[in-house]
Amino acid sequence: MPPAVSLSQVSVRFRLATGGTYAAVEDASLAVAAGEFVAIVGPTGCGKSTLLNVAAGLIAPSSGSIEVFGAPLGGLNRQAGYLFQAEALFPWKTALDNVAIGLETAGTPRAQARERAQTWLGRVGLSEFGARYPHMLSGGQRKRVGLVQVLIRDPRILLMDEPFGPLDAQTRQIMGNLLLDLWNADRKAVLFVTHDLEEAIALSDRVVIMSAGPAARIIGDWTVKLPRPRDIAEIKIEPAFQDLQREIWAMLKAEVLRGYAQTGGG
């Protein structure tokens, strides 16, 4: 089977108002197999989200190519579901309606869509919260609603852009375990962007490292050989986890410091 997503020698350059160009990503190649969980880590502003947007078909590369299950990608990647860092819930709709709306807009009868939405809410422990509006939910609860809002449409690929970034450490850990439970159930291809190296190792099969920008490149690709299923808290105290973290950090640290210097610490 061809990779779920394959980026080959992708470069992305943006035109500046001054007439010049800014190279965000340069010559990046990355393949994510069906059922594989791959995390991308790099300094702030290195182009991680840009690369994810290319995989989603939201940004066309300046050069290079993208294939989805072996077919060239032209336009939006309709095989993928995208979970952003910012919440995408409609504030005037209940949790149940927020989850069901994707099915309804795709033509599923309302009653059937709501029934499936209720089932999905149950899978993330929110069976009793379907009638609540987003402002009545905690940050972690809203993230769970957002996650099943994407998963209910059964995408073959899941693109995730720092989805747990705004959450506190304890809630991030809970969400990480929940994500792994859901992923273990059907093993979708996942491309997960994070700035947190520990999170990347704990969740993924592979950790891909990007250099500081501009013209960020993929400079490292590690296989995570930790056993599954995993518990986020427990796996972090394993010697093999700590050894891998030190090994990756030895490369990542220099890029983080370089990115920090380039942005003035912003």
Pin down the residues of each PLM region:
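Hydrophobic anchor residue at the start of the ABC signature
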Residues: L147
